[in-house]
Amino acid sequence: EPLTPLKLGGGNYEEISSLAYDPASPDRIWFSLGFGKGLFVYHRGGKTVDQIEPPADPGSSSVRALSFNRHGPQDGWYLEARTDDARWVLPLPAGGIDPPKNVGANPPKYVGVSPPKYVGAWKLIERIQDQVALPADKVSRMAAAANKYGIYVSSRWASGPRLKAHLDFLKAQGLNSIVLDFKDDDGYLTYDTKLEEPIRIGAVQKRFAIADIVQTAHANGLYLIGRIVVFRDKQLYKADSSTYAAWDKAAKGPWRYLKKSVDDLTGEETVFQGEYWVDPYSEHVWDYNIDIARELQDAGVDEIQFDYIRFPSDGDIGGITWRYRKPGMGKMEALESFLAKAREYLAIPISTDVYGYCGWARISNWVAQNIEMYSRYVDVIQPMFYPSHFPRDFLGTMDYLPRAKYIYEEGTKRSAYIVEGRSVIRPYVQAFRIGAETSFAPPVYSTYLLNEVHGTLEGAGSGFTLWNASNDYYMVTVPLGPIISQGAEAVR
């Protein structure tokens, strides 16, 4: 309980952005939380935590580094704090931390933690301007990709009356973009490709003509985003005797993620392969997908969206050996190498999808999704902040509907903070129900979706994409256009 400020629930914790032992009192450890979530002192003996008034308004600046210094051996210690844009010093009173005094307005509150304590006046030492100017082409791509609001459309819905229904929906809602599968979750190219390799391995299922879909999108004033599922690819996995498949080191064959299904009537159990993963270290796999992206670019698609830029997360992943891994290359380096190469060949904006928690916090040792690194090469990050996919006890003290808004608002802010202006943040909005959400009545699920949208807008996201794998956007029950145009003040 003393470290309540660290706990988010569901086994998740806030990031500690800096830490320093107090030389005047070894019992005290000073630490700050990332994303402007506060400055604290932990008293090891009493196992208590004091919240300290930070050198800037809570939430407006993060303390990135703490250190103790003094001018001479007989002088008193002072605390130095490096925030996002400045250096500050704080002389420490000889008697220790003072009782609460002038603590400012609306400080963060934590269960079992004292209100912020006034320990003296922070003194500004210098302002720091670390922001590096972005290259002109990067600025141009980000501007082209900004403020895009749309829906995901499966390739099976990309022609005829089904496509028309989606176009009518987009127009009625005041939306201006569409994400369309050009290489789907099974590894099939869904258009009339001219590329020899996908044709040779049987990885083409034409569902529309690329020239037609580009013309139709642009005629309707839509920004067309071409989705390419990269490292999850059943067709390339099977091609050429599984030459490029993730490899099972024990079975000495293609690695398989096996799942079970049970027949509700007979109880019969069936085992099947759930996902097919190719080797993210393989340069052939990189080139195969980059060639597809280049073909889309040449055909007039406005943006390339790479999905599944990660390593597998489920199954016996410890049993995988990566046959194309070069000495010294880790998972993050593999993904970075792919994105760096893609950037060389693509002049249009690149976006990539990431797990919601990978946009909420800096993590890279799980599936190697690291948006700080991604943002050096891509122009748009699309975190999937689906509230249903966070553990229920994550922010578990909040009611479900306000929690949905907070996850999107806070997550969008955190993602923007992590990438430091190098990428647009355009979250995927959960437009489907799962688990307990399936019992929501229309007014409830409508509020749920609107809360997500408002969270994105109030978190300063630059657009959003509604996601429903079945392409049924029934959760949208009020026009989104006015909400988007009026921003966060439209509906409360």
Task: Show where each model-derived region lies.
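Short coil-to-beta transitions that initiate beta-strands within beta-rich domains
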Residues: K7-A24, P54-P73
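Short loop/turn segments immediately following the C-termini of beta-strands
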Residues: A24, G34-F35, R44, H71, ...
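Conserved beta-propeller blade signature
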Residues: R28-F31, G76-A81
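Short loop/turn segments that connect beta-strands within beta-propeller blades
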Residues: H43-K47, P93-G95
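Active-site-adjacent "subsite" loops/lids of carbohydrate-active enzymes
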Residues: R141-A158, F231-D298, T447-N451
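Aromatic-lined carbohydrate-recognition surfaces of secreted/lumenal glycan-active proteins
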Residues: Y152, Y223-D233, Q305-P312, K331-V367, ...
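Catalytic domains of carbohydrate-active enzymes, especially glycoside hydrolases
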Residues: L163-Y188, D298-E303, Y377-V380, E458-F464
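Substrate-binding cleft of secreted/luminal carbohydrate-active enzymes
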Residues: V378-R392, Y400-E409, R414-V491
